[in-house]
């Protein structure tokens, strides 16, 4: 059976070296995590699979790695300075602080009904309730207290402050002087670096529409209440595509990317039953979006967003371009008085300039890792009554592809053979190959089941020509154990390379 709780996954991640709390020896930094020896391999494998699919295997995509430090004007004209904020509320009794919409989602139905009545919101729509509360914050704080809104930390009704907005961007200063002129931000998303480089990429590659720019990188959001392990954190990684299309073709390409991304996640090992496409209703759409479909996943803590695919129209390039009036921008954008470049596309047939629409598939790397771990976690009862935990990861994503294990660690002939074999398998370029000489083959198998290693190769007495029957007929053969079935076969080392290539290459 899969993980019964998020705590079960967290325990496995720490015990086996996937993910650690950052700065743990100093009490930890809330909402920040470090990837350990196995976690970094899993995360890198996921990113490489995404890059291979979306850049190498396509003829309409270019890559980019934009800087984390972001010019203030980029985030001013994108709208982040004014709108990148979440509603926040405090409990005066416990001194705890919560994001308002998350807090309300956790309330009993009778509490919410009292709030709807108090805020005069007729339709029981949580989004509409939050909007009404933010428009009348003083009234909302009193209504929350009167309605008996519960504090998740104590389980008791709270004494709530008026809700207010909190901008989630991390500020910093570039250079030795901390003044308004040197203000910059750690980027809250990777997308803006793509938009401001649109003309650079277009000029360098001579791309024709439709085409995309792909990027994987860190982003930073000062979340009010980071929670659920690596699901909602303050430092995270994104895999984003900005796919530029002609106006009028945007709805087709939006549908295309929703299906493409759903298919890819299934190919990574997530079951279709756990992936739920969710079409955002108009009241939930971001200010820039014409349409957004979220791919939700059934995490141990609930159904939550794994990836979003948004039709951003011409908002982004229209926000950052010069000559806005001449380009017929359809989205509502700030008047740009600073941009030095025209971020537009010239139709090769008509010679007319226009601002392309953008389709954005945006996935969280950390959420992807969490989904893979949750999906793969399996607790099995064995025929002998014992129990094992196995991570049934897609073999190509597994942190360790092959474990090479000498049957005993006190026979140099066996250990040296195993080391040579490890080097030979590593040269295949299939990923990490681990040599392990713990001396207890049974415990080694269980340990590698738990971290998802698809194949364990054992070097024994037969391998070095010292079979119990006194023959050398099994010389240069090894035992190969399958993680999922626990079945073992014997292969000649010359056959082993082809066997592993067939099962571990993309």
Curated annotation (Swiss-Prot):
Keywords per UniProt: Aminoacyl-tRNA synthetase, ATP-binding, Cytoplasm, Ligase, Nucleotide-binding, Protein biosynthesis
Q: How does it assemble?
A: Homodimer.
Q: Which residues form the signal peptide?
A: none
Query: What gene does this protein come from?
Result: glyQS
Where does this polypeptide localize? Cytoplasm
Protein name as catalogued? Glycine--tRNA ligase
Organism from which the protein derives: Thermus thermophilus (strain ATCC 27634 / DSM 579 / HB8)
Q: Where does ATP bind?
A: 221-223, 231-236, 305-306, 364-367
List, alphabetically, the NCBIfam families matched: glyS_dimeric, PRK04173.1
